[in-house]
Amino acid sequence: MGEPKIPTRPEALELLHRFNESDSLRKHAYAVEGVMRHMARKRGQDEEKWGIIGLIHDLDYEKFPSQHCVKTKELLEEHAWPAEYVRAAISHGWGICSNAEPQTDLEKALYAIDELTGLVVTTALIRPSKSVLDVQVKSVKNKWKDKRFAAGVNRSVIEKGATMLGVTLDELIDDTIKGMQEVAEAIGLKGNPA
């Protein structure tokens, strides 16, 4: 195992790709990374750290779905990731598959936006453009009310996360959209050519 070593993005990306072959899971990871980087910049935090943790937060989901978060902890520890990174990565599953309650702003942000990225993706995909570039807060809020729309998205987790962060739901949605717009091409939501 060795001494903890701060991972680089290329190392994190290689690990993500080794354990996740699914295009949709990889795109979700890129989306969460993009939002985490956006939020880190906005808050004057370490963008690289926030982004890397966003990138690998679902590391175990494809190969070990019944051990989600538990296996991520093991895998990251095997690769000598710092305990702070490991805890942050598994905190997004608090109350579902992890006992690590989000404490830091990084952890609270990851907890809040993980599910929200799914709602933004689904909102973008029903638009004629199929682009996140023209998704607005009001579009997501309109879909938010319809519990059948993106029914798998746990809206109560998103609301709880916004409260933990001390932001309004509108602000959280806006930050999520902006972060995803920054990585629109990587997540396949740049849209159809006009």
What do the PLM-derived regions correspond to, one by one?
Residues 13, 17, 30-37, 70-73, ...:
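Predominant activation on well-ordered alpha-helical scaffold segments within soluble catalytic domains
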Residues 18-22, 103-106, 166:
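Active-site oxyanion-binding pockets that recognize sulfate/phosphate
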